[in-house]
Amino acid sequence: MGLLCSKSNRYNDAKAEENAQTAEIERRIELETKAEKHIRKLLLLGAGESGKSTIFKQIKLLFQTGFDEAELKSYLPVVHANVYQTIKLLHDGSKEFAQNDVDFSKYVISTENKDIGEKLSEIGGRLDYPRLTKELAQEIESIWKDAAIQETYARGNELQVPDCTHYFMENLQRLSDANYVPTKEDVLLARVRTTGVVEIQFSPVGENKKSGEVYRLFDVGGQRNERRKWIHLFEGVSAVIFCVAISEYDQTLFEDENKNRMMETKELFEWVLKQQCFEKTSFMLFLNKFDIFEKKILDVPLNVCEWFKDYQPVSTGKQEIEHAYEFVKKKFEESYFQSTAPDSVDRVFKIYRTTALDQKVVKKTFKLVDETLRRRNLFEAGLL
């Protein structure tokens, strides 16, 4: 009898403990569900090379703890890969121009750099890249300074040459140091195509502060083959942040060299606007890479892009830069209203001029985005 009572007590104790654990799990789930309701979901979209992943990294630097040493070190092979890939692009591009261009002679690599170029092109075509040594850096520097490579670099818009090229080529000695650890600037400029989805949680006024919203920002792949993965993120989004590389009006896609990047961006922007799940979603348009745009517009006319063929320059210098920027901005405004259903006109639409590499600009922009979305929430709650 005593044994039966003992077993019964142990059973009751175990059952009580199990019930307590279940109740605790349910309580935590309820708390997490409530917490989730206060987290605003932001979707970071844009075509490939729009700079959205740089924006994402800036958020980590600005509103979180940044990159620790282990994370910085993890970018070392990425930086070195960018260097090798870029030199291969320029070397192979110069050979192509030397074969096909009327003024072919200026694209012929000098005799002393010919073998170096072939060697570096072979390395750039590998799946695994060697660590950048002082010897390799010296060879890369030699071919980078070759007149033919500089002529080719001047036509970089035709070759998918990345924005980080000049920066990394001017820092080869530092990048090849045996104790090299990437800096935050190196990380911001390092190019890795986003595949799949990455996310980050942050508050523009500090995590967990009562006065500030908490956001979860999702960055998804920008290349065409990545876009089918977006759909499961669409529901419940507070805002779409759509990035446009306004400097790339004269460039073609990485995945389709017959397609102008700006035309692709226009079509993507209009496609996103027409998605039913975004009818009530706020849109924040980041006209990004303004730093590159303001230099390029003085040399490359805006009307080389089919969408901007009606553009007429009015001046030179800073006045022309502003005129060209306002023209592009107006084009996107027109595109927005033409692609927006009449019953969606009450959703918020804002345009911001951005340079993803400029931390002050990004910080100021996200503070403005935060203010806009908080006012929207108050309006929807009937408090404004």
UniProtKB/Swiss-Prot annotation:
Any one GO cellular component localisation term in the record: heterotrimeric G-protein complex
Residues binding Mg(2+), per UniProt: 53, 194
N-myristoyl glycine: lipidated positions: 2
Segments for region (G5 motif): 354-359
Keyword terms, alphabetized: GTP-binding, Hydrolase, Lipoprotein, Magnesium, Metal-binding, Myristate, Nucleotide-binding, Palmitate, Transducer
Domain text: The helical domain (69-189) is required for self-activation.
Protein name: Guanine nucleotide-binding protein alpha-1 subunit
Higher taxonomy: Eukaryota, Viridiplantae, Streptophyta, Embryophyta, Tracheophyta
